């Protein structure tokens, strides 16, 4: 079952990305390094609901 999730920048708090994940394969929260347009650099983004 795929669900929609939002990725939030851990440094500035902006919610920059919307993606999907498979809850069976990844039951824990996802953490990815993505580009933050406000800070203009790659930062850690965490899953929010």
Curated annotation (Swiss-Prot):
BP-aspect Gene Ontology terms: translation
GO terms for MF: structural constituent of ribosome
Domain of life: Bacteria
Annotated keywords: Ribonucleoprotein, Ribosomal protein
Disulfide cysteine pairs (residue numbers): none
GO cellular component, one term: ribonucleoprotein complex
Alphabetical list of InterPro entries matching this protein: Ribosomal_bL33, Ribosomal_bL33_CS, Ribosomal_bL33_sf, Ribosomal_zn-bd
The keyword Ribonucleoprotein is annotated on this UniProt entry: yes
Family note: Belongs to the bacterial ribosomal protein bL33 family.
Name of the molecule in the record: Large ribosomal subunit protein bL33A
Species of origin: Listeria monocytogenes serovar 1/2a (strain ATCC BAA-679 / EGD-e)
Gene expressing this chain: rpmG1
């Amino acid at each position: 079952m795929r669900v929609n999730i939002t990725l939030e920048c851990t440094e500035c708090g902006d919610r920059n990305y919307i993606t999907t994940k498979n809850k069976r394969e990844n039951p824990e929260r996802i953490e990815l390094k993505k580009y933050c347009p406000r800070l203009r650099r790659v930062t850690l983004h965490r899953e929010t609901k």
